[in-house]
């Protein structure tokens, strides 16, 4: 396959590179938001309230974990049920450098839009209860002070489709 305009080939290695670029972009943007909310965020190493069983990720992201952590998957012991299988006994993430998108934005103030055919678009917001701050209600934050769900998921679905997968297929982390 030839190179695309962005310099990546269209095969698996090119898609893997684009996924890494996307994760890096998410990390930078999330880092900016973390800086804006430093007084409210209680997230940190060992905080695992968001790291629960039942979280699903895009198949293309699960493949990244499989590729970079084959020995952990083969020989490691998963965290006991109830928390993410990738947590170590101290609550630290064993795949942190390759963690999926959802894990890179956990804890941030989130917003998403629901477009109703019969009515107006409705905005919803949420945040981890540990990071809720009554002195700064979510409803009063500017849209640029929240992580907007949707755009990155769309880009992940595109990468997954290009890899040959079903665009919206999700994989459990356990």
Label each residue range with its predicted role:
Residues 1-45, 49, 56-174:
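Short loop/turn segments that flank or connect secondary-structure elements
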């Amino acid at each position: 396959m030839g190179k695309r305009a962005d310099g990546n080939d269209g095969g698996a290695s090119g898609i893997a590179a684009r996924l890494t670029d996307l994760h890096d972009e998410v990390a930078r943007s999330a880092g900016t938001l973390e800086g804006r909310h430093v007084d409210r965020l209680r997230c940190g190493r060992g905080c695992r309230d968001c790291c629960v069983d039942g979280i699903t990720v895009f198949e293309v992201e699960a493949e990244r974990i499989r590729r970079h952590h084959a020995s952990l998957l083969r020989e490691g012991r998963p965290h006991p049920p109830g928390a993410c299988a990738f947590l170590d006994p101290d609550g630290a993430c064993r795949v942190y450098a390759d963690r999926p998108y959802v894990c890179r934005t956990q804890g941030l103030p989130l917003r998403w839009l629901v477009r109703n055919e019969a009515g107006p678009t409705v905005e919803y917001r949420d945040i981890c209860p540990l990071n809720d701050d009554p002195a700064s209600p979510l409803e009063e934050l500017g849209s640029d002070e929240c992580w907007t769900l949707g755009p990155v998921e769309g880009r992940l679905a595109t990468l997954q489709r290009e890899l040959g997968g079903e665009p919206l297929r999700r994989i459990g982390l356990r």
